[in-house]
Design a protein with these regions (language model features):
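Thr-Gly-centered strand-to-loop micro-motif
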Residues: 35-37
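Short loop/turn segments immediately following the C-termini of beta-strands
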Residues: 25
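A conserved beta-turn-beta hairpin within the catalytic core of GNAT-like acetyltransferases
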Residues: 28-33, 77-79
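Conserved N-terminal beta-strand and adjoining loop/helix that marks the start
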Residues: 1-21, 39
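Unchanged
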Residues: 40-63, 72-126
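Flexible, glycine-rich phosphate/dinucleotide-binding loops
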Residues: 21, 29-30, 74, 121
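Local beta-strand/beta-hairpin segments that build beta-sheet-rich folds
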Residues: 68-69
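Nudix hydrolase/Nudix homology domain
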Residues: 30-33, 102-153
Length: 153
């Protein structure tokens, strides 16, 4: 394990009419789905980062929400802590935004998608630990906040 501090990310789970909002990323020809989210900026709270990332990537404003899940990812020297918020109130119409974090990386934000439970079960969603949590709590989004554990490749 690395001595470097972990990277902390904030992301948002937004459900509407039985569908979950996801963003599609492409990296080295590999397409996969994630929740809208990203890294904290200096001086930013987790909640502020989650709201900013949702706005940047989808154009939606998150008005209210709560912490829903914490998980970790370890791969070699890389350690990421993901903080997932559940959006309870939002405004706007979704549109494909930008992901400034990928500007100088070989990863691109290529789409936004609303997935129903069946489509989500078949989707290439990352991280898989969070995907299992989302599938298990699809019908009960008011589940208490939980620590999901550590995912390693």
């Amino acid at each position: 394990m690395s001595d470097a501090a972990p990277t902390v990310r904030a992301q948002v789970a937004l459900f509407a009419d039985g569908h979950l909002l996801c963003v599609r990323h492409r990296k080295s020809g590999d397409d996969y789905l994630v929740l809208p989210g990203g890294h904290l900026e200096p001086g930013e709270t987790l909640w502020e980062a989650a709201c900013r990332e949702m706005r940047e990537e989808t154009g939606l404003e998150i008005l209210e929400g709560r912490l829903w899940a914490l998980s970790e990812f370890h791969a070699g020297a890389r350690h990421v802590v993901d903080c997932t918020f559940y959006a309870t109130s939002w405004s706007g119409r979704p549109r494909l935004g930008t992901d400034p974090e990928t500007e100088f990386q070989p990863m691109t934000l290529v789409g936004i998608e609303w997935l129903d439970r069946e489509a989500f079960a078949e989707a290439a969603f990352r991280p898989t630990l969070l995907a299992r949590w989302l599938r298990a709590h699809w019908e009960s989004p008011d589940a208490p906040a939980a620590y999901l554990g550590v995912e390693s490749p």
